[in-house]
Amino acid sequence: MRGEASRISDRVSRDELAPKLRSTGKDAWRIGNELFTITNVLDHTVQLERALTDPSRPVDDKIGVLKELIGAQAHPMTLEIMSDLVGRKWSRAAHIANAVEDFGVDAMMYYADAAGVTLRVSVDLQE
């Protein structure tokens, strides 16, 4: 279960960035896949999770780490999402990976909507 700071950070970030993520249309597929890849890396690299969530580390430094790792390759929206997340407070370092994964799911649903297959996704999820 996530702590209060993590729940708030996840919810506020997703609420604020949802319109921008939705507006990426079919690029949301790429963004979602990038976010799932980042989730996997975070889940397997505790040091990176800590580096990106350390409250004593300046946000600009955290964003610098992100740009070094994914900046040139990632979709600009992926970098914007990650930059927003590293600027927020987390109850535990591991919670940022959960938030990244939540964004990945959101991105895939926005892609499904842009591709006109939202109903099919809903049916598939119920089966």
Regions found by a protein language model. Name each.
Residues 1-127:
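Elongated, mostly alpha-helical coiled-coil "stalk/stator" tethers of large membrane protein machines
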